[in-house]
Amino acid sequence: MIPILHTEKLCKSFSNGAAQQHVIKNLDLEIMEGDFTVIMGASGSGKSTLLYALSGMDKPTLGKVFFGDTEIQDYTNDQLAVFRRKNCGFVFQSIYLLENQNVLDNVLTGAFAVQKNSPELIKRVKELLAKVGLDEAMQKKYPNQLSGGEAQRVGIVRAVINEPKILFADEPTGSLNSTSGRDVLDIFTGVHENGQSIVMVTHDIKTALRGTRVIYLRDGKVVGEHRMAKYGEDDLKERREKLTGFLDEMGW
């Protein structure tokens, strides 16, 4: 596989009064094209900070971030915005939908097509929404009429409608019940099966099991890595035991 993203000596610090809090420390990391990379670690280990730096949502303090062969860490804010629109999709724990728009229009608003209301685009959005369990009746509902799991599904469709090269997710099931969480993970698994590269932060083993690669952060550094087959291609019990064993070794 080819790296779609990689870092060189990546550092990220935050000012804490007169002191500097060093969150990511000289990190060299490759994110492979077509991989489902899961970032795990204890609270405060730098998981979300790393995700934001990789995605161009936050600039590193030092070091380099490459998207393919292109360095992005020195982009202006406007250049980063263009980069994100063209290449990245984002799904967060809290999904922010426009309250005055229904489900269909929320996704259409996020589309970058020149003709946002073209019949072709509307048809594609409707098909994607139906594929994640949001039928035509659901597509007419407004955000205040949706459950957490339903809103998250809208967020995922909105994130993939522009066919991003890489999808970033930060604790996407963190606020969902077990049933809704499983449904959302099934969608991510389907997206990955279609060839989508995914980078996801989680603290949940059930979520991590969906990945093909788990990296473990401690004090801003990668201290371990665990590889897995695509979800569904191996015995789930054995898969869980191996991942649990790896996390135990990491002191999780």
Predicted features and spans:
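Helix-to-loop junction immediately C-terminal to a conserved catalytic motif
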Residues: 55
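Conserved ABC transporter NBD signature motif
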Residues: 63-71
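Conserved catalytic motifs of ABC-family nucleotide-binding domains
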Residues: 163
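Catalytic Walker B motif of ABC-type/P-loop ATPase nucleotide-binding domains
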Residues: 167-170
